[in-house]
């Protein structure tokens, strides 16, 4: 949905168009899942819309390099998991991209539970598959306890969609 334009190396606005398919939910044999890609994790509205549409597990495939992004990687998605009562699988690549070498991709893929706790985490420098057993009953337990969706006030958020509100 959102396209970054940052230095060094991420000049994606020149090569890609923003997505326009909205936030679809995919019903699998195991859970309802939603996907928001890389840069979209910086926009909490993406995770919120997926959760409001019924997603139980969100996935965020990313290719992000060390620096400030690494701090945000540990902060944003656990916060989104709590705010939306979902599991999140945050996956990031590792290594260098030759020949450009504009930064080290720091891996650190993880699963976070609806309470914001990281339940399994990958390494910073090895290609690997991160696997977790997710108890979907935790979603209902957390949502019933914290009631964030019940207490939403959409009537107070209209400025978010009004032209010129930024």
Where are these regions (language model features)?
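Short secondary-structure boundary segments
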Residues: 61-63, 91-94
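A generic fold-level signal
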Residues: 18-20, 83, 104, 124
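Catalytic phosphate-donor-binding core of small-molecule kinases
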Residues: 75-76, 83-87, 93-96
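Active-site catalytic loop in hydrolytic enzyme cores
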Residues: 1-56, 66-79, 145
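C-terminal beta-strand edge segments of enzyme domains
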Residues: 92-166
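Short, Asp-centered acidic motifs that coordinate Mg2+ and/or phosphate
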Residues: 56-57, 87
